[in-house]
């Protein structure tokens, strides 16, 4: 095999390794965003109410708690990533 072929082959291996590393970093970042969203919407943590920037704060001063559960549609940051949505659908 020629030296040029070996050089291109090594370059391709390096690029594929870089791609894998970037994909892993992206997966970790997307999981971190998902976790932060979950933490933000955590109804059991601290306040028992479900008032936030997405649902609004109407009725926040009422003594009764709002028992609405978070839906996947509330995950505007996680769902904004096409690769994350595809990853979830593939599972």
Curated annotation (Swiss-Prot):
Biological processes, Gene Ontology terms = chromatin organization; DNA repair
Enumerate the subcellular locations listed in this protein's record, separating them with semicolons.
Nucleus
Key words, A-Z = Chromatin regulator, Coiled coil, DNA damage, DNA repair, Nucleus, Transcription, Transcription regulation
- Kindly list the GO CC terms recorded for this protein: NuA3a histone acetyltransferase complex; NuA3b histone acetyltransferase complex; NuA4 histone acetyltransferase complex; nucleus
Please give the coiled-coil regions recorded for this protein: 1-43
Its main localization is: nucleus
The entry sums up its family as follows: Belongs to the EAF6 family.
Instruction: Give the protein's biological function.
Output: Component of the NuA4 histone acetyltransferase complex which is involved in transcriptional activation of selected genes principally by acetylation of nucleosomal histone H4 and H2A. The NuA4 complex is also involved in DNA repair.
Q: Oligomeric state and partners? A: Component of the NuA4 histone acetyltransferase complex.
Q: Which PANTHER family match?
A: CHROMATIN MODIFICATION-RELATED PROTEIN MEAF6
Protein name, entry field: Chromatin modification-related protein EAF6
Which gene produces this protein?
EAF6
């Amino acid at each position: 095999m020629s030296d040029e072929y070996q050089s291109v082959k090594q370059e391709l291996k390096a690029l594929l390794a870089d791609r894998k590393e970037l994909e892993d970093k992206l997966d970790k970042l997307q999981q971190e965003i998902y976790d932060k969203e979950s933490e933000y919407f955590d109804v059991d943590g601290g306040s028992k109410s479900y008032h936030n920037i997405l649902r609004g704060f109407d009725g926040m001063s009422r003594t009764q708690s709002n028992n609405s559960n978070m839906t996947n549609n509330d995950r505007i940051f996680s769902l904004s990533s096409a690769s994350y949505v595809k990853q979830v659908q593939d599972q």
